[in-house]
């Protein structure tokens, strides 16, 4: 087959998602990632945005990590901002160290990738557009502060996990733009915007709001793809999806 080399993946990213179903993550991943980068998913079944719910899933997480290792992935990311926020940064970093010890593969999370990306961009003041309740938003802000980023403004819709799982795609897409715009308008000193969460389609908001406000806009996947490529020393800028991936 003449084009076999062009079709063979040059990087396999293992991704452990918090949810039983995976739709919006791969749908958006293959629009943001450079051609030839493969997403290899394994699913948890997170019942709620709490530490107890995350603890319940840890045995399955380790089984998935072993499976992803056998599949030959180059890196494993534990997806889901609520996972990191619920556990706190100290526990997350201990889990990442344990994962690397068990598998010999680099481990990261969406939250750690977001912090790495914001630090790279020089962002210390952040606005957030979120669908989550205030307790979770507070936990996200506390986690980011440990990484040198202060959340100075946020707009939220206060939805539960069950509500977010059933949110229509079109409604979620409109909500992402509305919340992001409102967050930046309410916090003019913010240096960037974060639209966290994997249960909604948000990639369209990146170029739209960056053009409108002249500030970087990040989502889970843009930060994770960027951090993965940079950690591997792979300079593969992606155009059209915001400042971060273009860098």
PLM regions with names:
Residues 1-63, 135-137, 141-171:
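N-terminal glycine-rich anion-binding loop in soluble enzyme alpha/beta folds
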Residues 11, 37, 102-123, 179, ...:
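Hydrophobic structural segments
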Residues 16, 74-79, 127-130, 190-197:
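Periplasmic-binding protein-like
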Residues 18-23, 80-89, 131-136, 198-203, ...:
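Gly/Ser/Thr-rich loops at beta-strand to alpha-helix junctions
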Residues 60-66, 174-186, 191, 198-204:
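A short, acidic, amphipathic alpha-helical segment used as a generic capping/interface helix at domain edges
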Residues 65-112:
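Glycine/small-residue-rich loop that forms an oxyanion/phosphate-binding "nest" at active or ligand-binding sites
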Residues 98-162, 245-246:
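Conserved beta-alpha
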Residues 159-164, 213, 217-237:
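Short, flexible loop segments at boundaries between secondary-structure elements
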């Amino acid at each position: 087959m003449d084009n076999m080399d062009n079709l063979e993946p040059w990087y396999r990213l293992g991704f452990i998602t918090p949810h039983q179903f995976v739709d919006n993550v791969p749908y958006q991943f293959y629009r943001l990632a450079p051609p030839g980068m493969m997403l290899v998913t394994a699913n948890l079944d997170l019942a709620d945005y709490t530490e107890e719910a995350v603890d319940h899933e840890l045995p399955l997480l380790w089984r998935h990590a072993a499976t992803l290792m056998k599949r030959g992935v180059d890196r494993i990311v534990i997806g889901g901002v609520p996972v990191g926020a619920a556990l706190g940064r100290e526990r997350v970093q201990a889990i990442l160290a344990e994962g690397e010890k068990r598998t010999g593969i680099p481990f990261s999370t969406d939250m750690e990738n977001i912090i790495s990306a914001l630090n790279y961009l020089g962002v210390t003041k952040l606005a957030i557009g979120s669908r989550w309740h205030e307790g979770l938003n507070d936990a996200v802000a506390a986690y980011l502060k440990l990484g040198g980023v202060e959340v100075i403004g946020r707009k939220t819709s206060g939805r539960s996990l069950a509500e977010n799982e059933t949110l229509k795609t079109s409604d979620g897409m409109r909500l992402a733009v509305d919340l992001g715009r409102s967050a930046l308008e309410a916090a003019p000193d913010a240096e960037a915007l974060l639209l966290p969460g994997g249960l909604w389609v948000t990639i369209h908001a990146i170029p739209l709001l960056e053009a409108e406000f002249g500030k970087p806009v990040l989502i889970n996947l843009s930060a994770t793809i960027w951090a993965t490529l940079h950690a591997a020393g792979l300079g593969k800028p992606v155009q059209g999806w915001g400042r971060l991936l273009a860098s």
